[in-house]
Amino acid sequence: SSNDLNEFTLPVWVAAAAKSATNILNGHKFKDIEVIDLPNKEKSLSVPISSSSLLDNGKKSLAVSHCKSGLSLDVTRGLEVWAYIQFNKITGHPQKTVQNDFPDWLDFHAGYGVGKFESSGEPCLSKFALDLLCINLYPLRPKGFAIKVEIIFPEGKDRALRTSNEAFGVVDGLSLIGTQAEAQISA
């Protein structure tokens, strides 16, 4: 048997780290596996988490996952993913992010090593990546609060130099693209 090798695309590892950090901030014990639900509800995935901790006297949290994409040439293989989480009270006027249709409860920040569009400075992430975050984080949100998510790829900037991202107007790191959960092994 191939023994489920946890070969998922980068958005899955990002959602898993964000979910782990959100659970920790909600007072739950660390689990080294997070279950990630997929947008079409066809199934859920068990995703390994390396570590997670509270920070700043329990006001923030951080979780780390390591991307195993299964493709030996894939620039994301072995990439360390950091997710910082913070809960912020939603005030009377929740602001919508114009470009990427982020819901008002999700305050997404592309941190160091995460690709941004050169033209707008907006984070470069696919609808699939955003949907994964929304589906998996929304149920964990404390009532009346927004979840601030900052994703960091410590090696993202260096690894992006090995991609043609810049030709597509993406700078500063690796883009969070991908339209499916499992890494495709092409023949």
Describe each region flagged by the PLM.
Residues 1, 5-31, 37-43, 52-187:
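N-terminal loops that bind phosphate or other acidic moieties
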